[in-house]
Amino acid sequence: FGVNVKEKIRSLKENIDVLTLTATPIPRTLQYSLMSARDLSIINTPPSNRVPIQSEVIRFDNNLIRDSIRFEIERGGQIFFVHNRIDNISEFGIWLQELVPNAKIKIAHSKIEGKKLEKIMLEFINNEFDILLSTTIIESGLDVPNANTIFINNAQNFGLSDLHQMRGRVGRSNKNAFCYFITPPLSSITDDAKKRIAAINQYSELGSGFNISMKDLEIRGAGDILGGEQSGFINDIGFETYQKILSEAVNELKNSEFKRLFKDDQIDESTTEET
């Protein structure tokens, strides 16, 4: 959702209390909490019987992909395979079917008619086929405890929040889950993409959403606190310097200036009475 959509509720009623729930707050939203403009509560305790997802950054390796898919199917599980290009997802599906001929594969993306797409999703939830090859439409809202392996193709093209959400499609039971971030050689991707891949691979423990959001804030910047931009760049001064300047400005507005004003008023009143 954009800033205008999220803030629209405030136009309906003044001084309304708003509770925002998110796995990975965007930089602008997180910055509000860090500068004490909003209260922040963190849920660090995962649901019972969950285990951390084993994450790995890999090159596009046919043997590794085939072996990982076979392992998951042999233990009775299912697989998500994210390929975020509708224009060639059908061709990609043909390659995948040739790689694992015995697997049942179906494709899902936003251009499929609604009822047909819903039918595919329900069939996957009901364990009627093995691999769901899809775009990022599976990013949120799907709870398939039997799906415990996910491949994310060209992971370097996604934001940290997207990667975290997609990884969260697996590991929703007490089984070991696996997430494979498929990227080109790291030498061929941008510096920010390297930082995102390193961060998502580092923070794989349960309850890491806040750490990932902090890293996202550091990489992308806080955005426009008073305007509509949800992320921005603070490379010119550095993240720590930006945080310090912002905190000092907020504290000055909240405390220092007001205290000084009230103190001056008291002095003026006492002086007037003595006179």
Regions found by a protein language model. Give the residues of each.
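Post-DEXD/H (motif II) to motif III coupling segment of the RecA-like Helicase ATP-binding lobe
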Residues: 1-78
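C-terminal helicase module of SF1/SF2 nucleic-acid helicases/translocases
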Residues: 20, 62-80, 84, 88-275
